[in-house]
Curated annotation (Swiss-Prot):
The gene is rpl15. PANTHER family: 60S RIBOSOMAL PROTEIN L27A, LARGE RIBOSOMAL SUBUNIT PROTEIN UL15. This is Large ribosomal subunit protein uL15. Binds to the 23S rRNA. InterPro entries: Rbsml_uL15_N, Ribosomal_uL15, Ribosomal_uL15/eL18, Ribosomal_uL15/eL18_sf, Ribosomal_uL15_CS. Residues 1-13, 23-38 have a biased composition (Basic residues). Coiled coil: none annotated. Pfam families: Ribosomal_L27A.
């Protein structure tokens, strides 16, 4: 077993126990404060050198009232919904009439495949959704 004497035992009788002058081991005064203290005062040069972007604001946050959060549904999911609940939708001229806002969606996106001709009413459509609806023989109506 290793028997190593502790540092404090070796330092007995040395007055300062390896901390230099007696004043240097009191509180945080020898360091100029604890942690980030003094970074805008006496430690400013070290901030400029090592962390220049620490202070100040950058960028901006958009006003949440200006951001549109639309509920979306893909065109493939919409067709599955129509096939699942056939009785809930009207058929005019061989096309199923779907109002996306009535089922809780504002925007129709273009992911998926459709084979049903339908008239889709929504607030917004993506370009892909418009193309797929027209390719299936349907039409879209923006509200």
């Amino acid at each position: 077993m290793i028997r190593k004497s502790k540092k404090i035992t070796k330092m007995r009788g040395s007055r300062t126990c390896g901390y230099g002058e007696a004043k240097k081991h009191r509180g945080a005064g020898h360091r100029g404060g604890r942690g980030n203290a003094g970074h805008q005062k006496h430690k400013w040069l070290s901030v400029c050198k090592f962390n220049p972007d620490y202070f100040g604001k950058y960028g901006f946050n958009r006003n949440p009232g200006l951001i549109k959060q639309l509920e979306t549904i893909n065109i493939g999911e919409l067709e599955e919904y129509i096939l699942k609940y056939k009785d809930a939708f009207q058929v005019e001229d061989g096309k199923v009439v779907v109002d996306a806002t009535e089922i809780g969606f504002e925007k129709v996106l273009g992911k998926g495949r459709i084979s049903t001709a339908m008239v889709v009413k929504a607030v917004e459509f993506s370009e892909g959704a418009k193309e797929k609806i027209e390719a299936a023989g349907g039409e879209f109506v923006e509200l």
